[in-house]
Amino acid sequence: MDSVIAFDRSPMFRVYKSGRIERLLGETTVPPSLTPQNGVVSKDIIHSPEKNLSLRIYLPEKVTVKKLPILIYFHGGGFIIETAFSPPYHTFLTSAVAAANCLAISVNYRRAPEFPVPIPYEDSWDSLKWVLTHITGTGPETWINKHGDFGKVFLAGDSAGGNISHHLTMRAKKEKLCDSLISGIILIHPYFWSKTPIDEFEVRDVGKTKGVEGSWRVASPNSKQGVDDPWLNVVGSDPSGLGCGRVLVMVAGDDLFVRQGWCYAEKLKKSGWEGEVEVMETKNEGHVFHLKNPNSDNARQVVKKLEEFINK
């Protein structure tokens, strides 16, 4: 039975009938470096040994007494693949920190199917709360105490990480987690979905749709609503309680999720939420193209837009 494939999402992963998962992508890691890379240093922290939850912290090499904006980043991968330590994420966060002159904290949460939804959200929430223990300057991590500006906190992520950023910001307001603490969120090609097309412009490929539905079953096997689960069908939920003042949604023209991103922004505008939302669309590009081709002009524009949003 261990050799019988139950769900094949190559080239990303395979799940066998025994329950075993074979991750084909996103398992390579790169170490942090106190030797500057592109003017940025980094280190890893285990902040919850009992759950083995860790973070990678990035800091500009040349820092002054001036506090820096804090970027808390959640990686993508459908809640199943990739880590905060994957080479594409290390490269992207290094570039983002160099451009925005910010302090970045890249969160490594536990993944499905070993740790199914909602565990990735709970791990991310715990990581956010750990970061906030540094508000008074007496937290366990010196870099955050010394250099982090808690008046400028941004949550960001791509794909599943964008999904996580939305849900944490909703929860932060609902649970009154330091009112008005989160300045804004940056959702890059957010992983939102629904059972039926979100609008008349959403064109669905049958094979890709089955891939999304199957992947969600792997990530959230106990979901009774399937892809209409509120964790995933974000556009079908009420976003008016979003706990930040500004939102940037980045979408890619050839991405399966492009209309979800646009409709999320439109719904946010009409919901009664009183913040500002903007959308940046990159034409003729696919899902997370900026991670796959980080040296392309379009990828550089993603970093530039992120920098502008943080430092506005």
Swiss-Prot record:
GO terms for molecular function: carboxylesterase activity. SUPFAM superfamilies: alpha/beta-Hydrolases (SSF53474). Coiled coil: none annotated. Keywords: Acetylation, Hydrolase, Serine esterase. A motif (Involved in the stabilization of the negatively charged intermediate by the formation of the oxyanion hole) lies at residues 75-77. The active site is at residues 159, 255, 287. It comes from the Eukaryota. Its EC number is 3.1.1.1. Expressed in leaves, stems, flowers and siliques. The modification N-acetylmethionine is found at residue 1. It is an enzyme of class 3 (hydrolase). It holds the Pfam family Abhydrolase_3. It catalyses: a carboxylic ester + H2O = an alcohol + a carboxylate + H(+). The keyword Protein transport does not apply. Carboxylesterase acting on esters with varying acyl chain length. Belongs to the 'GDXG' lipolytic enzyme family. This is Probable carboxylesterase 7. It comes from Arabidopsis thaliana (Mouse-ear cress).
